Design a protein with these regions (language model features):
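Conserved acidic
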Residues: 232, 253, 345, 349
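DPxDG-like acidic metal-binding loop motif
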Residues: 228-250
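C-terminal nucleotide
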Residues: 1-210, 221, 259-271, 277-400
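Helix-loop-helix module between adjacent transmembrane segments
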Residues: 187, 226-228
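Flexible, acidic active-site loops/lids enriched in D/E/S/T/G that coordinate Mg2+ and/or position polar
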Residues: 214-220
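Inter-helical turn/loop segments and adjacent helix faces that build the functional surface
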Residues: 247-254, 297
């Protein structure tokens, strides 16, 4: 009855994991699907509830269809924030190169509260800091005009890969996880080099580049392995968007670049939140806060850096590479499902994480190294509680 009368009930605010178990366990028929004029996030919750119920009933294929619908609808809501078509125009001289560089990020508290759909419903709080490696920003992008050919050349120094993009169709093939050039293709599309995002209309990519005045040569360098847990992919995407912004005179500020990075990751179907890109493109240590809603633009509160830079504390911090990597997509998918289903244990932990970020903010403001260190330990336990893969045996062996 609650499900049938969803407009006047709290059904979609309940623990939908438990509801799915009740429906499947008692062989109850699923309620009618929600109409298209229902709130988008409610339809997202409905699709994931159906997916979980069908999965428990052993109807795997139908469950996967509903799960894909849930993620697709959330993607739709986030992409609506970026459907402002662009008019890229050449903003550099023929012999100029745009060079974008970014640090990576470490989050100290509140990680995961930046992830949709949690942040869309409740907002998020994250404390993170931008870091260089050996004094150099490890993520770099170079863009220069190509006057000889009216197409786009993509190169990766660290991967030793190269690809020539000559058509809109080739540029649109960016949602293949693991492709070396998914990020630059999606960034160029968002910048207006694809009909879906361009104000003008052209018969082909070649025609658009002729009107633009040149082809493009894009070179990427990532001095950090993907899957290292430092926000590499998101920050590389933000760096690419920033470089394209300068090259094409798009007029985006850092907040807009951060927002479009969130959209780019939805285009790639990798998902993800906002803390990685803002952690990298905004320097120093900061508290990032958002409110509920589809537009996730963080308020930035800068924090003093004494506990990280003063001589008495610098040796207390160590960044250690374990050699273990994980791609974010699979990790995100499982945790996001719990958010969709309003799983009580997930939501309670995320609320604790959100408050924990404010506690960390106070400790750093008070310049208390002991309290900050204790709270980092709390962050570690919270991350393990939410994601069991955070601390595999090989990592625990390093700690021991």
């Amino acid at each position: 009855a609650l499900a049938r009368n969803w407009q006047r009930s709290v059904f979609y605010q309940l623990n939908l994991q438990e509801a799915a178990e009740q429906f499947a366990g008692h062989h109850l028929p699923l309620p009618e699907e929600l109409p298209q004029d229902a709130p988008l996030m409610t339809r997202v919750n409905d699709a994931m509830f159906r997916s979980r119920t069908l999965e428990l009933e052993g109807k795997t294929e139908a469950a996967h269809e509903q799960e894909a619908r849930a993620f697709g609808q959330m993607r739709e809501g986030l992409l609506e924030q970026a459907y402002h078509r662009q008019s890229p125009h050449l903003s550099v001289y023929a012999d100029q190169i745009v060079w974008g560089r970014s640090p990576v990020r470490i989050d100290l508290a509140g990680g995961w509260t930046d992830t949709p759909p949690y942040c869309l419903n409740e907002g998020g709080n994250v404390i993170n800091l931008a870091i260089t490696l050996n004094g150099q920003p490890p993520l770099q992008v170079y863009i220069k005009p190509n006057k000889e050919q009216y197409h786009i050349i993509l190169r990766s120094i660290d991967l030793g890969a190269m690809e020539a993009v000559t058509t809109y169709e080739e540029l649109r093939h960016f949602n293949v996880v693991g492709s070396p050039f998914s990020i630059p293709k999606a960034a160029l599309a968002l910048a207006g080099f694809h009909p879906d995002f361009c104000r003008e209309r052209y018969a082909s990519l070649e025609e658009q580049l002729k009107a633009f005045g040149c082809g493009l040569e894009v070179t990427l360098l990532s001095a950090i392995p993907a899957g290292s847990g430092l926000g590499t992919s998101s920050i590389l995407a933000a760096t690419m968007l920033g470089a394209v912004n300068d090259f094409c005179g798009l007029g985006w500020d850092k907040q807009e670049i951060g927002n479009r990075t969130l959209v780019l990751e939805q285009l790639l179907t990798t998902g993800g939140g906002w803390q990685d890109q803002y952690g990298g493109i905004l320097p120093g240590i900061k508290l990032l806060q958002t409110e509920s809603g589809w537009k996730q633009t963080p308020l930035v509160r800068w924090l003093p850096e004494h506990l990280f830079t003063d001589s008495e504390y610098r040796k207390c911090h160590l960044l250690y590479y374990t050699g273990l990597t994980r791609t974010a997509k699979g990790i995100l998918a499982e945790i996001v499902k719990g958010m969709f289903l309003n799983r009580t244990e997930h939501l309670e932990l995320l609320r604790q994480m959100k408050q924990h970020a404010l506690d960390m903010h106070d400790a750093i403001q008070r310049n208390s190294y002991e309290e900050m260190a204790r709270l980092v330990g709390v962050s570690w336990k919270q991350n393990q509680a939410l994601d069991s893969g955070t601390n595999p045996p090989a990592v625990q062996a390093v700690i021991d």
